[in-house]
Amino acid sequence: MPLRDSLSNTWSHIQGFLFPMLRDEVGPLTDKQKQVVVVLEVAGIAAFVHMWPGLPGRPPADRHAIARAFVAKAVLALPQTNMLIERLIADKTLRRLCGWEHPGQVPSEATFSRAFAEFAEGGLPARVHEALIKETHAERLVGHISRDATAIEAREAPVKAAKPQAPKRRRGRPRKGEVVEKKEPRRLERQVGQTLPEMLADLPKHCAVGTKRNAKGHTESWIGYKLHIDTADGDIPVSCLLTSASLHDSQAAIPLAAMTASRVTNLYDLMDSAYDAPEIKANSEALGHVSIIDVNPRRGGKVAHEDEARAKRAANYRLAEDLRYNQRSAAERSIAA
């Protein structure tokens, strides 16, 4: 079913049936509570959470209810688990939407933390997102995929990763019979022959210090992580990848492209100058896409590149690729949302 028809049918069901039924069952809903209901209905998160009843020992807390509370925590922008618990105890309607009738049934903070850790370890949000994208884009041809990354700040100490020290060698030509170790290939070179799981395992995921130049040309630093996003036309994020903040944007481009190619069919890959690398261009072409990447002038070529761009603007000369590149603003809107 086309994406527009699928969303239209889902919204008609929510507006015409689900909201009236819930209004009779739990009472009037606020706008935020309606947002929680919509996300729960569209994502169908309970289908991705497994329960194992009948096992010996104390029965575990209802993971379906905790998963719904996990969604409510994100929709209501509650940064801490104790804030979610306080909200569930005070808000009867929200509590019943999640699946608990009485305040005493709301689990403790430790139980929530263990369950959330299970969800993160099992990749619950990523699996729900992947299934939703595949379902809604199965019969859709995406024109442009805009690739970008954004900072994710974290309240934890950065981990200093130990860099392997290369063995020192005397300067000059090697002696006769001396074996010179070859340089280890760069990550982009390694990724060309790796599978997606191998590429993902090779990316650093610890908390680190990141530095990025913003749209105004100023350098910003933060402690935490970096979220790499592929955004389709319509500002729809189709693939996301979380890495250390210190990882350069280009290092996540090839695995992110592999994830996106398994979910949607697209024509153009739009990237800024941080992704200007021959391996990324070749990978895009191998997937059957046209890559439009802003030029990264290296080795003193910046002045010549700016002069050429200025001359084109003066002559009102614009290529079709330049017009398509403007679609990359979808990535910025997706990140801002």
Residues covered by each model-derived region:
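Alpha-helical architecture
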Residues: 60, 106, 146, 270, ...
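Charged, often Cys/His-bearing segments associated with DNA-binding zinc-finger transcription factors
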Residues: 1-47
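Catalytic-loop motifs flanking and including active-site residues across diverse enzymes
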Residues: 65-68, 252, 330-334
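Short, positively charged, Gly/Tyr-enriched micro-motifs
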Residues: 59-127
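Basic, short loop/linker segments at the boundary and entry of helix-turn-helix/winged-helix-like folds
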Residues: 28-76
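Helix-centered, glycine/charged polyanion-binding patches within enzymatic domains
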Residues: 273-337
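Polybasic low-complexity intrinsically disordered regions
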Residues: 86, 109-286
